[in-house]
Amino acid sequence: MTPQVLTILGSTGSIGESTLDVVSRHPEKFRVFALAGHKQVEKLAAQCQTFHPEYAVVADAEHAARLEALLKRDGTATQVLHGAQALVDVASADEVSGVMCAIVGAVGLPSALAAAQKGKTIYLANKETLVVSGALFMETARANGAAVLPVDSEHNAVFQVLPRDYAGRLNEHGIASIILTASGGPFLTADLNTFDRITPAQAVKHPNWRMGRKISVDSATMMNKGLELIEAHWLFNCPPDKLEVVIHPQSVIHSMVRYRDGSVLAQLGNPDMRTPIAYCLGLPERIDSGVGDLDFDALSALTFQKPDFDRFPCLRLAYEAMNAGGAAPCVLNAANEAAVAAFLDGQIKFTDIAKTVAHCLAQDFSDGIGDIGGLLAQDARTRAQARAFIGTLR
């Protein structure tokens, strides 16, 4: 068997580490060509020692020099690259068959798009790629024969329970709606009057999942679910009015598909990202993920409730941006990234995140942008507007 050759973008984050855990269980199936780890040099050096990639990519020359010194000390022959173009290069290299796109934020868009242009199998964990450039990205993938496999647990769950020949045809397959589940985050039952006193340390403590700081805050505001709605719209060619969100605090049911005949098919499992990663990497096989069996005896109850937009205004804003279309999702994402960064840095209150996003969505912006240059320019304009607004909140 010829192993699949992988580039893993965001290898030092939680998705990247989970991916490498799955890869390590199947050395005969996978070979790592490149790892990208931004600024976590020590962790990336350890990964290079274990997986021996041809290339490792970091953010800049300073971190590249540090990584080179560590690799030289340990006798690891991996070549070190740095910068945005290096991410594009390792994502589109001829040797590579599959790319794990797990860089957080819109900064992951150019490398994901480069992989699509080269017809790679794309394991998509970077939801911002589709939020910012859904039409452009999916059309690029289709035109170049790139397979886009969803790694996000919710979209992966939907992918697993849809007919294999689904290909975006809802009506033909009798699909009434797609239902994304959400845990509700750490503040599902907290007093709304305390929200303006929520600290970054509290917001990053997710009750069920192990995630990075940014996505943990997005889960706490439910912006994460809003971004996932937009992602599902593009991934599954699903109209906004056929997308539902239900809060399911136990995070056992990862998503559902409602069919016209009254059936609802769901995918269940322990909340561990290695399950969707292994499903994508192993297709069409089911391979060992390292995740334990779901213990039904230990489940006391599975509960569900509708999301409350007063508690989660970011989810409402995401619905509005999805329905508006055009550049609105790009604006939504850029404003949210700027606001979450400011919150984590202690510059604004938790409740100011939604205020910042609402402010930016109220500004004038182009209805539609058809190329990556225009999208990145809109992203930059919105971030500047968000930073200016944040300055008035301090």
UniProtKB/Swiss-Prot annotation:
Known pathway: Isoprenoid biosynthesis; isopentenyl diphosphate biosynthesis via DXP pathway; isopentenyl diphosphate from 1-deoxy-D-xylulose 5-phosphate: step 1/6
Record-linked Pfam families: DXP_redisom_C, DXP_reductoisom, DXPR_C
Cofactors demanded by this protein: Mg(2+); Mn(2+)
Annotated GO biological process: isopentenyl diphosphate biosynthetic process, methylerythritol 4-phosphate pathway involved in terpenoid biosynthetic process
Keywords (A to Z) from UniProt: Isoprene biosynthesis, Manganese, Metal-binding, NADP, Oxidoreductase
EC number(s) given by UniProt: 1.1.1.267
First-level EC class: oxidoreductase
Catalyzed reactions: 2-C-methyl-D-erythritol 4-phosphate + NADP(+) = 1-deoxy-D-xylulose 5-phosphate + NADPH + H(+)
Residues annotated for 1-deoxy-D-xylulose 5-phosphate binding in this entry: 127, 153-154, 183, 206, 219, 224-225, 228
Molecular function GO labels: 1-deoxy-D-xylulose-5-phosphate reductoisomerase activity; manganese ion binding; NADPH binding
Transmembrane stretches, start-end: none
Binding site for Mn(2+): 152, 154, 228
PANTHER family listed in its UniProt record: 1-DEOXY-D-XYLULOSE 5-PHOSPHATE REDUCTOISOMERASE, 1-DEOXY-D-XYLULOSE 5-PHOSPHATE REDUCTOISOMERASE, CHLOROPLASTIC
Function: Catalyzes the NADPH-dependent rearrangement and reduction of 1-deoxy-D-xylulose-5-phosphate (DXP) to 2-C-methyl-D-erythritol 4-phosphate (MEP).
Protein name: 1-deoxy-D-xylulose 5-phosphate reductoisomerase
Organism: Neisseria meningitidis serogroup B (strain ATCC BAA-335 / MC58)
Taxonomic placement: Bacteria, Pseudomonadati, Pseudomonadota, Betaproteobacteria, Neisseriales
